[in-house]
């Protein structure tokens, strides 16, 4: 059997084995894992002499592990496994044979031994640590820990045990944690003194002999210290051993692996300080350990001081020491801010804070960002503490300037790009992203300082920015771009203090002192020669700042032409990233300065002309045969989407009130005509399904719609101050609508063309107004086709709601004409079967938009169109769909809306209220529909009971209650319109037909006649719940 298992493992791991045979071998080994007796064969395979191959032994032990952890080995058998492995360990590790197992096997054995410890240490293997310690000596008579291979294995298990029961980062169930806590208690009672003594012996005897042993031992001390008696580690013997290892930091040249020992020794101190204890004890511990001196010595060591700013600088040690500084300062601050801490302790903590401030600054200002990031948490805690104090006593803010000033200066310095950075390079993107993330974190710290001492922050930043622009004035393009970028970045952040409600000004005056300072900075920046901004990073910063502080230009209008000229240079930038971002920012700027840019409209349109040429690119055209073609296509899409901002900017500029309508049309035609020609040129090819031509027309239509969006912010029914453009301009945009419709009618089978046309339609409403109404049938015919998705229908319905709301006085005849064919397409979309979750979501959305459309028609006094002679044939379908939706147990939102539509129909067509107290004082908006009262009673009323009669209906569900409230509202509306006729119907037919008893009927009818609309809406859900009618 053993040979069979060994052969199977060998075959399964052999890459050149026959695939069929290999599959059989895999299956055999996997069956072995679940076989209750499989572990016995594998244990024997692992411990055999002579040893099997490494892969056989590894897999064999893995099977044993799997069986043990999977519960296939009972306690008695676990003892057998323990005895077998212990005998193996004594044979291989206990005699310093010199040929111990490779690391992967050692780790696997350690894992097994750790599991056995968890299972048997409490009962069954009480001598666990004695047995393992026995491996650390070459013979029972040895008086020292002299067996290297045994020591390494012992420490490997020690560290594994911590991972199993002591590591707080490991997620455990409640039972697992309870077991871990019990095991820790047992260790502390039985063996802790013994274990810590072994660490001291190992560190003493192997201090210079074996770096691997010393490193592993230090890691064990550092990990276990968090849950053992601190006195077992913090004692003179152990500290002397630790200090000796720290001394390695003073060596100029370390042998390979020695730096790991040094760093592990520092980590021990970090773990000691990280141990939970009272603030008073922690402060005393920091003083006792003399951490200030330790950190000073480490900071002044050759790797961190002598080699700083050279390629030999030891960043690993710097980060390790920074962790020690960080955890120490966090505890110092905690002692300062916690209530109940003695005055004496706080005084000691204050002294420590002053002592550690140079250490904070040293590592916070480290040129390596990962080192700086390591101490950000303690800086954040410190500033949070100082901010809290300043709020309680603002006078203390100035006293803390000695702390805040150097931190602020360090923050600003760290925000500067370092000398090795190369902005914009493809292979630098990760570094750039990490640096920007660091800048964000530093920005938060800077905001905290501003909140503590605003005056200090303003003075430091203002001085830095002013000095930078003065240097720029003197040195021009010779200035290091990093310095200018830093100043601009600080200007951008300064707005957090200066800008209120999106502006630097309130009633024409600067918001505050910060706004005054920022206005001075803006003057310096804008009056600088942009040619001095030679680097793309600074050029982008310039545009971002101009947009963020556009309110500045409202009060310095003479500077606008120069700024626009600078922008027009940047929108032609050779670097794509700068160019496309500038397109967006240019649109933002002209939108915010619309009223001031009319005098340069012609110049701008001409300057942008070459950028308004649309070139659609298919993936194959971008990089044929390249695996990255999809990314290139996304890039091409992103570039076009950015280009649209230019079309919007042109629309904004051309629409300024200072330009006469004829000039507006002239500028518009300069942009529109090339697009019309392009559409005409590509239309025939697009009809032949040429993909590039179809995409080109999609882009053209999107550009036309975006131009319209820029031209007018007005939307029908909105309370915006904007108005429709002049008639001449609307006529020009009528050409846009016509060109779009021609393309749509020819290419309505294309989803992309429909999408672009729907967008254009939504924007053309704002520039055409009611002129668009006669075209509605053509828009509907093109946008709602046999291939249109439910999503498309829902989006268009939403647009129609807006049109109805905006033009309710003019749309009746057109709506009357198109309603039946339009709704037939919607019904078709609703009736189509769904094939997945996405389909179901789209169907639900379409149902809601259909109901919203009906509400829009009814709410805008257009309900007559639904019952007109032309649309009478579809009326029954409209009603039946609503009835169906009102009974949908799986979609309460739609059901609620369905009842709202039925209530609105009832109030619109049911005639005047016959119940005086039910009237809300507003007569029905439309003429009553003959016979509709009886229709409401017989068709609508039973629906109120349909949904709650469903077996799966839960009346306690919050959404269900809302549906019932809406159903109750419908019943009250029917009663208001029909009075006693409805009550009689309920008494004699509807309620008895449902099996309701006479007493309940009278109570229900009484409530209906007695309560007002609001009262009955509340009553109906409670009624159903209390009367248990749900089973009827």
UniProtKB/Swiss-Prot annotation:
Superkingdom: Eukaryota
Pfam families, sorted: Exportin-T, Xpo1
Subcellular location as annotated: Nucleus; Cytoplasm
GO biological process, one term: tRNA re-export from nucleus
Disulfide bonds: none
A GO term for molecular function: small GTPase binding
Family that this chain belongs to: Belongs to the exportin family.
Record-given protein name: Exportin-T
Species assigned in the record: Aspergillus fumigatus (strain CBS 144.89 / FGSC A1163 / CEA10) (Neosartorya fumigata)
Encoding gene (name): los1
